[in-house]
Amino acid sequence: MAVVVIAEKPSVAEDIAKVLGVSKKNDTHWESDDLIITWAVGHLLELKTPEEYDDRLKDWRKSVELLPFIPEKFELKPNSGRGTNRKQLTAIKKLISSKSCTEIVNACDAAREGELIFRRIVEFSKAKVPMSRMWLQSMTPDSIMRAYDGRLDSSSYSKLRDAAVSRAEADWIIGMNGSRIASTFLRTGRNDGTSMSLGRVQTATLALIVDKELEILGHKAEPFWELEVDFKSGNSEWSARWERRNNVEDKDNPLTKAHRITEETEKQELEKLLNSDGKFLTKQQHRDSKENPPLNYDLTSLQREANSMWSWTSKRTLSVAQQLYDTHKLTTYPRTDSRYLPEDMIETIGKTIAQLGAQNHLKSHSQRLTDNGLQNVSRNFNDSKVSDHYAIIPTGKIPQGNLTGDAEKLYDLICRQFLSSFHPPAIWDVQTRVTTKDNHDFKKEVRILKEAGWREVKPKSNSIPEKWNSLDNNPAATEATSHKFKEELTKPTNRLKEAKLLSLMENAGRSIDDEAMAEAMKGKGLGTPATRADTIEKLISRNFIQRARSGSLRATAGGIKLIELLRAIPVEWITSPELTGDMEEKLSSVQNGEFSRQQYMKIIFDKAEEMVTRIKNHDRSELFKDINSIGNCPKCNEQLTETVLSYICPKNEGRGSGCDFVFWKNTSGRWFDRSTAARLLDVKELTDLHGFFNRSGEPYVASVKINDSGTVEFLGGGESTSSSDDDELCECPACERGTIRVNSTMYACDNQECKFRGLSQEMCKRKISVDEAKEIFVEGKSKLLDDFTSKKGRPFSAYLKLDGNRVKFEFPPRKAAAGAKEFPVVAGVVAICPKTKEEIVETPTFYQPSNDGSDCKIQIAREMSSRAISRDEAKQLIEKGEIGPFDDFVSKKTGKNFTSILYLKKNQAVGYKFAKK
C-alpha cells in the first residue's frame, strides 16, 4: 500500500523525495515501499475547445448564432503539448488509480493554479481514494518535512478549488466567446497585425495602456520659461529656481506650476529684477523628515522594483524568483500577494537573520539587528494580512557560488529588503533655502542623511551641491552671479513602464502610492501577481501593445482601435479596469467562502451574454453618429464624420465619386486621435508633432499639414529626418539634394521634403555601424551581415539593400540541408537568368547564381523529393519557366511516388504543380 504525492514539476518532486527518504527513481516517479513521488509538468490537462463539444462550432462565422456557447459541463482533455506530457499523465493516472494507492497528496504550488493542476488530474483519472494537501511555503528540507507532516484533508481547500475552477471557466467563457464574436464582427479592412482576441483581464489591461497612449497623443505642447539663478553668499554657492508666490496649481494644466513662466510681461519683470541694484536675502530652514523602512516584497512590488532599477520585464523577474525558490532554495514562494509575515515566525526570522550574517556583504547588517534587536515587529508580523502565502524573504540558506548574474542580483535585493524591514527609520535633514528680492522667491532644497537607519542596508546618496556649505548668517546677504531663462515646451506624460503598469493592475487602474490604501485594494486588482506578467506578454505577442528598447509600453493602432470599438458599441465592462477589478474581488470572495461559485459563474454567464449580444447586434455606421464632428472637410466644407478607421467627408461615396477627402486615423506610424486631428484641421499645419513610430517601434517627431488642395501631407522631420546639427554621413541616394546624417536613432536625410524613410541604427536587435550604413547608401547594398535576431529569437544573416525610399533585407541563398546529397560539379554556365542576366552555375547541391550577392533569386536543388534534377532539366526550367511532368518524385510523408510539374514562381522560387488527374 502506498501514498502517492503529486508535485508540480520534476525538480520539486526530487526535493521532496530526498527529504522523505525516497531514493529509487523511475522515468515517471520516485518510489519506496510505501511512498511514491510523481510530478506534473505544469498543466497536463486543459478544457476542451467549443468545437469539441459541437461540430457546428468549427466554422466561427457560421456558428455565431450559437454564441455565447457555455457547456452544460466542462470537460477536460490532455494538453496539446509535447508527447512527454501525455506519457506523464498516463503514468500518474495509473499510479493514483491503482488498488495499492491509499492516499493522494497534492504537493503542487500552494496557490490557485497548483490546486487546479492537481484537481484536474484527479478528476480526469476518476481516482476515488482520500486526498490531502501539502502547503509548501519554501523548499528547505525543514519546510518540506513540516508541510508533509502537517498536511490537511483536501476538503480544507475546497474554496480554493472553487476559485481556481471558476477562474479557469470564466476565462474560457469570456475568451472563447469573445474572440469568436470579435473575429467575426470587429475586424476591419486594414490588417494591423493584431490577433483579434478578448479576455477578462487582458482587455481591461489593454484599456489602461490605450488610455495612457491617447492622453499622450492628444497632448498639445505649450511654451514656457523656467528661471535658474546662481547665488553666492560667503563661501556657499548654489543654484535656485524662481517660484511664484501664492500660486494656485491646476493639476490638469501643467502651465500653472509655480516655477513656469508663461507671460512675456512676467519674464520682463524678472529680467528687470535681476538687473537692478540691491541685495538678495536668503533664509534657510531645517526640518527632519522620517523615511520609514520598506515592507518585505510580494511578487508585484518585487517586479516593480526590478523594472525600475534594471528595466527587467515582469516575466524575467518572476522567472528568476522562481529559480531562487525551487532550484536554489534561497528564497520563499514567489507568487505571493502578501508583504507581511505570520506572527508565529518571529523566532524563525531571528535565526534567518543570523544565518545571513555568514555572507560578508550582509554581515554588518545582520550583526546590527542581532545586537540592537528587531524594529517594526508589530508592522511586519501581521496574521490578518497574510493570505495563502507570506512575503518573499530569504530562507537563510547560503548561496553555493552557482548563481547566475540575474539570480545573484535579485537574491541580494530580496535579502537587503528583508534586513531593511527590521531596521529603524532613516532621518533626513531637509534644508530649504529661500532667496528673496522684491517679493520674488528663488528656492532650493537639499536632503542630507542624518540618521542612516535602514539606509545602511539600502544606501541612498545625499542631494547636496558641492559648494553648499553653511551660511554665515541666517538670513544672509546674497548676490546673484548669473541667471538663465530656459525656454521649454510642455511634454506629454511618460508612457507606462511595467513598474507603473503593475501598480495600476494591482489597484484596478487607480494610481495609489500610499501603502495603507494599496493594502485596502488587495484582491480588487486585474489578475493576480502570478498572472500579470503573462497578461503583459500576451498583449505584446498579439500586437496590441509594443515594448520599446527603453522598456516603455505603447498601444498599437490595433489595440487602440479595439478599445475604441468596444466602448462605442458599448461593451463597457470588459474595457473597465474598475469593473474587472470588482469581478476579481468577487473571485477572491469565492476563495474566502464569502461568495458562492454559483453566484460568481452567474455573473460571468450574464457578462458573456451581454458581450455577445451587443457585439453581434451593433451597427458600425451608427457608432459615432452622436459624437461631435472634429471639423469641416478642407475640400468642400461639409462637417466630417467619424468611422472606426477614419475621419471622412460625408460626400465621399467611394470609387472616385463625390468628395474624395478621407483622413485615416492610423497614418504614417501615428494614430491621429480626435483632438490632434481637430487641431490639424483648424491650423492646417502641425510641426514637430510627437507620437510617430518607425517600423522598429522607435518614436520620432514629424510635421504634417493640409495643403492647398485639401490633402493631408507629411513633411518628415524628427527621427525620420535629420538636422544640420547631426553628424554628416554622405549624400542622400533617394533625393540627391539632402545629406544623410546620424541622429539619435537613425541614419536619415536632412531634406524636409525627402521621402526616404531612413535607416534605423538597430535592426532586428543588431546595431548598424556607421561604416555599414555608409556602404548601403553609397554602394546600394551592404556586405553579408551576421547576428540579426528574428522575432522568434533565431539568429540569421542578411544583406541590407536600398530599395527606392527604404532599406530592406535581402537574404543569401539558403544552405543545403544537413545530409543533402552532393553531386559532381561540371564547370561552365548552365543558363542565364531571364530577369537579371546573371550566370547560373552548378554547385554540389544547387543550380544558382555564380555571384552570391546577386539580385537573381534562382536556387534549384539538385535533388528534389528524392529525384535528381539534371543539368539540361535545370536549364529548361530557368529558360522556359516549367518542366515535367515527372512521375518519380517520392513523398517524404508517405514514401510513395507522386507526379508533378516543376515551375518557377514570380519570386523565382521553385514550386510543384500537380498534373490534373
Label each region the model flagged.
Residues 1-176, 375, 481, 492:
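Intrinsically disordered, low-complexity regulatory segments
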Residues 109, 309-313:
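A conserved hydrophobic secondary-structure block that centers on an alpha-helix together
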Residues 251-295, 670:
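Metal- or metallocofactor-binding catalytic centers and their adjacent structured scaffolds
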Residues 191-193, 197, 209-262, 309, ...:
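C-terminal helical "lid" subdomain and adjoining coupling/linker elements of P-loop NTPases
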Residues 90, 99, 143-229, 287:
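C-terminal or mid-to-C-terminal helical accessory/interaction module adjacent to the motor/catalytic core
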Residues 2-4, 80-81, 85, 96, ...:
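Basic, low-complexity terminal or inter-domain segments flanking catalytic cores
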